């Protein structure tokens, strides 16, 4: 990797694996852009754009948003977001082999190929316990958990004091659909990046500080 303050990576893992906890750590450490497709989609939904309305309908049913929507949104970020000049942490993308191939092609054309794909690995049973208690501060995307990471004041954001919400797709049935979709569509991505030689796996059932240390170790940055 080019310098200690630069990174171009993909963060892979099922819903609730801790991507939302670790990505800000990576963003701060490497001064890179955290490109979270979930946050981008929720921003589009909040603005009521056509893309947002289409995405909300799919997400509320526990499905995954189409390749075309995702590819166009990511390409726009990589082209127009100044923070991407110091690198980027892609979170929630790519989810499929066609997306991974399109991403690789685009990044190679721009002379900024991926350096690492880190997979956060967790058992489904633990994910269910983690995710069904998750609370979100909509304006910032900060996440809490009723059991594992509660806010200082019940149902209030630590920073602003504003109300927290439980996401509408954070219920058991929708979660099972999301995990089934994740396993079916995303696990081939791991094989794809293993073949290209940039994959590394991290046990994400460990405490967050241990997971962070492991990530830095896999990146060769500890």
From Swiss-Prot:
Propeptide part(s) removed at maturation, as residue ranges: 2
The record's catalysed reaction(s) read: AMP + ATP = 2 ADP
Tell me the organism: Saccharomyces cerevisiae (strain YJM789) (Baker's yeast)
- EC category: transferase
Q: What does this protein do?
A: Catalyzes the reversible transfer of the terminal phosphate group between ATP and AMP. Plays an important role in cellular energy homeostasis and in adenine nucleotide metabolism. Adenylate kinase activity is critical for regulation of the phosphate utilization and the AMP de novo biosynthesis pathways.
> Per the record, what about its domains?
Consists of three domains, a large central CORE domain and two small peripheral domains, NMPbind and LID, which undergo movements during catalysis. The LID domain closes over the site of phosphoryl transfer upon ATP binding. Assembling and dissambling the active center during each catalytic cycle provides an effective means to prevent ATP hydrolysis.
Phylogenetic classification of the source organism: Eukaryota, Fungi, Dikarya, Ascomycota, Saccharomycotina
Q: Which UniProt keywords apply?
A: Acetylation, ATP-binding, Cytoplasm, Kinase, Mitochondrion, Nucleotide-binding, Transferase
Q: Where is this region: NMP?
A: 36-65
What is this protein identified as?
A: Adenylate kinase
A GO cellular component entry from the record: mitochondrial intermembrane space
UniProt xrefs under InterPro entries = Adenyl_kin_sub, Adenylat/UMP-CMP_kin, Adenylat_kinase_CS, Adenylate_kinase_lid-dom, AK2, P-loop_NTPase
Where on this chain does AMP bind? 37, 42, 63-65, 92-95, 99, 167, 178
Q: Which family does it belong to?
A: Belongs to the adenylate kinase family. AK2 subfamily.
What are the N-acetylserine sites (modified residues) in this protein? 2-3
Q: How does it assemble?
A: Monomer.
Localization of this protein: Cytoplasm, Cytosol; Mitochondrion intermembrane space
Q: Name one GO molecular function term.
A: ATP binding
Residue ranges, annotated region (LID): 133-170
In this chain, ATP is annotated as bound at 16-21, 134, 143-144, 206
E.C. code: 2.7.4.3
The coding gene here is: ADK1
This protein's record includes keyword Nucleotide-binding:
yes
Does Acetylation appear among the keywords? yes
GO BP terms, alphabetized: ADP biosynthetic process; AMP metabolic process; ATP metabolic process
